[in-house]
Amino acid sequence: MSLYEHVFIARQDLSNAQAEGLIEHFSTVLADNGGKVVDREYWGVKTMAYKINKNRKGHYAFLKSDAPSAAVQEMERLMRLHDDVMRVLTIKVDKHAEGPSIQMQKRDERERGDRGDRSDRGDRGDRGGFRR
């Protein structure tokens, strides 16, 4: 079996529970066809660079799988037929990266709120710039 990574974007008007339900549904499709989902991540609602089907935002999901190509093709076919899924990207990888994806790492940094490169600065009043 081969290793794959999948990203799909679902419509913005779905609830978080419905978006997570889509992840579960497509994981089941892979399992039913002889594959398995190694890891899954829900990245949340993100703003897209351009509109897709009149949607400016979408629910992003990421799956890592170990599956035969037939299982992946079936899952992609069902994703493309599903009305709630707007875009699908599947890539074949040599090995899965350990730990959370880059998107989840960025999300964790934002939630912490600390900007390590800016901790030495005070309020705006102490900046040197031009004064009248």
UniProtKB/Swiss-Prot annotation:
Task: List, in alphabetical order, the Gene Ontology terms for molecular function in this entry.
Answer: small ribosomal subunit rRNA binding; structural constituent of ribosome
Keywords, A to Z, come to: Ribonucleoprotein, Ribosomal protein, RNA-binding, rRNA-binding
Q: Which GO terms describe its biological process?
A: translation
List every stretch annotated Disordered.
96-132
In its keyword annotation, does this UniProt entry include Ribosomal protein? yes
> Basic and acidic residues composition bias: which ranges?
105-132
List the record's Gene Ontology CC terms alphabetically.
cytosolic small ribosomal subunit
Gene3D superfamilies assigned: 3.30.70.60
Query: Which Pfam families does this entry report, sorted A to Z?
Result: Ribosomal_S6
Q: What does this protein do?
A: Binds together with bS18 to 16S ribosomal RNA.
Question: What does the sequence similarity comment in the record state about its family?
Answer: Belongs to the bacterial ribosomal protein bS6 family.
- Recorded protein name is Small ribosomal subunit protein bS6
Task: Please name the source species.
Answer: Cereibacter sphaeroides (strain ATCC 17023 / DSM 158 / JCM 6121 / CCUG 31486 / LMG 2827 / NBRC 12203 / NCIMB 8253 / ATH 2.4.1.) (Rhodobacter sphaeroides)
- Please name the gene that encodes this protein: rpsF
